[in-house]
Design a protein with these regions (language model features):
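Terminal alpha-helical segments
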Residues: 1-128
Length: 128
């Protein structure tokens, strides 16, 4: 697969995660906040990794958005603008997958969806 096609696929998968997050939060009752949070983290992770691939870097097999954002910042210092979003979204990658770890409330997921969209849009803009 060409690098361009691979980057496109990473962004497609990231967008799908965002769609799932919004569906779990907006369309299901009761709201599936833990699943929505997980997919917000996944959206941001895949968008950051797409940016790294676009810049000919092999993304590490990690889920810590803070590390991925720092790697992106080393390429483009403007990634500092989304560092706080990445830091907050990191918690949803593991803790929401297990009972009694993190049960996000409605306000937390409302913010997580907004921030996942911000990270996605930011990364996409940086490859144009």
């Amino acid at each position: 697969m060409s690098d361009h096609k691979l980057v496109t696929e990473w962004f497609r998968y990231a967008n799908n995660d965002l769609i799932v997050a919004k569906h779990c939060f907006n369309d299901l009752y009761p709201k599936q906040t833990e699943i929505a949070g997980y997919h917000c983290q996944q959206c941001a992770e895949k968008a950051l990794k797409a940016f790294l691939i676009f810049n000919s870097m092999e993304p590490p097999k990690i889920h810590d958005l803070r590390v991925l954002c720092k790697m992106c910042k080393d390429i483009n210092p403007s990634f500092l603008e989304i560092a706080n979003q990445c830091s907050r979204l990191t918690a949803y990658g593991v803790a929401t997958r297990y009972p009694d770890e993190l049960v996000p409330d409605i306000n937390m997921i409302t913010l997580a969806i907004i921030e996942a969209q911000q990270v996605y849009d930011f990364c996409l803009e940086k490859i144009k």
